[in-house]
Each structure stands twice: as C-alpha cells, then as structure tokens.
Amino acid sequence: MRYRALVALLLAMCVGFLTACSEEPISLLSDETYTYDQIRNTGLANSCPQLPETARGSFDLDSETGYILTDLCLEPTSYFVKEESTNKREEAKFIGAKALTRYTSSLDQVTGDLTLDSNGVLTFEEQYGIDFQAITVQLPGGEQVPMLFTIKKLVATTAEGQTGISTSTDLTGDYIVPSYRGASFLDPKARGQATGYDNAVALPAAADDEEIMRENVKETPVLDGNISLQVSKVKSETGEIAGIFEAIQASDTDLGSKEPVDVKIRGLFYGRVEPKA
C-alpha cells in the first residue's frame, strides 16, 4: 500500500510538471489584450509591453509640431553595484546583484514632452507618471543595497541631425534621484529630519560626538542619475517604440548616514509618440 501511494504521488507530480511545461508563455505584445486571470499570479503586471521582432520601421517628426512620449515603461532586468577592489591598484568595478524586490520594480505610465529643434536634436523632458520604485538588491556576499529607481525630471537628448525616430535613435540624459526615505521617517531610535528626537535618548551627552553625529543629523539629499535609451523597435503605424536602457544612479544614503554607491540598471523600455493635443 505504501508503494502504491508513492507511485501515485510521483505520477501526479509528473503530470502536473508536463502540464505546466506544455502551456505557452504569455508575451505582452502591445496590440493584444489580456484578462485578469491571464495576468494574476504570473508577475506579468510588472512587465512592459513589447513590440514584435518585425517592428523595424521609422517615422519622421516635424520641428514645428509638439509631441509627447506617453505610456513610457521601463522594466529592469539586471542590476550591478559598484564596489571598490581590495587591491588598491585595481579600479572599482560593477558586481552583479540579485533583486529582492520582485514584482514592483518597473516604472510605468510616464509622460513627457518630445521636441525636435532646428538642429535636428530630439529632446525628451519627463513630466509625470509612476516614475519611481523602491528596490533592494543583494550582492553575492549577502550585502543588501536599497535604492530608489527613478527617472524624475529626466532631460534626454540625441545627437544632431535627426529627422525622426528610427532603430538607430539613442536618447541620453540626466535625472534626479530623491531620497529613499522622506524627512518624516523615524529610525529605530526615533530620530528624523523633520520630526522625532535630535539624538539617541540613551546618549544625550554624546550627541555632538563626531562618530555618531552623522547618525543623529538626518538628511534627505537629492542625488544624480544618468540613463541611455536605445531604440531598437519602431512601429510607425502607431508611433510605438521599444528598446533597451542602461542607467547609473546613486543608491540610498540611509538619511545621510552612509555614502551612496553607484548602481547600474539595465532593462527594457516601451513608449508611444503622439502629437501634442
């Protein structure tokens, strides 16, 4: 009887495995609609729409017409943290990291102005949208690095001589990285920038000590980031574009108590160009 139960269990597991493998993966093509049941519990809600591999077109833009880049979505796929080498003769290099924040990492519904000047320079200026996500990544040694992935106030431009958007269009620019935590956040000792204690209650006499001053004086610094958007797919009929991006930005400073480190984020992006209403 025991062997029969074990065999039945193994058969059930094999059937379940084969059934799961036989299902075709869902591809989030931009021109298809999906039901709630297709998306639920799959993690696809964090994925950006995609364009087919055959989308290799281009479209022209008029320098006298205003445009917007809307529904911009950026989906991170890999992370790297810059670490100093133990050998002083070697330069710091980026180390691959694993994301601990699994299903809430993409930026979405971002909109901004898109203009083409008389010199053929295409400029995108981010205005609003879901333009930040709190993400934590883990290095191979176990160290965790929190950061605020964002493109707030991004101003990205192309080289001169552009007449529109094609699969060779590259947009590069800088943006700001707000503090991971706000001024009203309290640390475990109830210290904050805008509220809470000025110093640790257990050490009032040592509040001005240089070693703990940085922990007591909270700051919410605004740091910098840089991103490159490389268009690789264009659907000229609908104005849709897609491609890859690479961003390098600062990590969290724990309200000013730690030095930020550079984090490199790579991934996919999607957007749609429309004339301004």
Label the predicted regions.
Residues 182-258:
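Acidic, glycine-rich flexible loop segments
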Residues 17-20:
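C-terminal motif of bacterial Sec signal peptides marking the signal peptidase cleavage site
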Residues 1-9:
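Bacterial N-terminal signal peptides that target proteins for export
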Residues 22-24:
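Bacterial signal peptide processing site
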Residues 141, 153-155, 233-235, 245-251, ...:
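Beta-strand elements of well-folded, non-transmembrane domains
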Residues 26-209:
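An ectodomain-focused feature that recognizes extracytoplasmic/extracellular
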